[in-house]
Amino acid sequence: MIKQVLLITALMASSVAHAGFYSGSALLSESEGYVKNKSGVATVAEAVNGGMFMGYIAGVFDTYAMQGNRNICPKAGLSVGSASDAVMQYLNEHPEQLNYSAPSVIMLALTATFPCERH
């Protein structure tokens, strides 16, 4: 079942990612499916939304990591789930930023949660 959801998520995310109009508000909406999926009570549609939430966060994180971003310094072994939890918490605590682009909000959340030590 999880493999099927991930496949559907990957197919759907490919049509969303290039548009560039994905907002923090849309991300927060999909986090509801993520929460329900973690609890084991998600419908298929909610599980897909939860998978899209996690996949979008992982994609933004990986993109910035490949570009050599030095503002996010998670401990080794950070899971997509932990990053997703951090972003979801940030979205709930900063509703004034829901109109920001999803990548911007994700980077703000991860930078706040996993700051780098400055020497």
Provide a role label for each language-model segment.
Residues 1-8:
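Sec-dependent signal peptide recognition
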Residues 20-84:
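Short N-proximal segments of mature Sec-exported proteins
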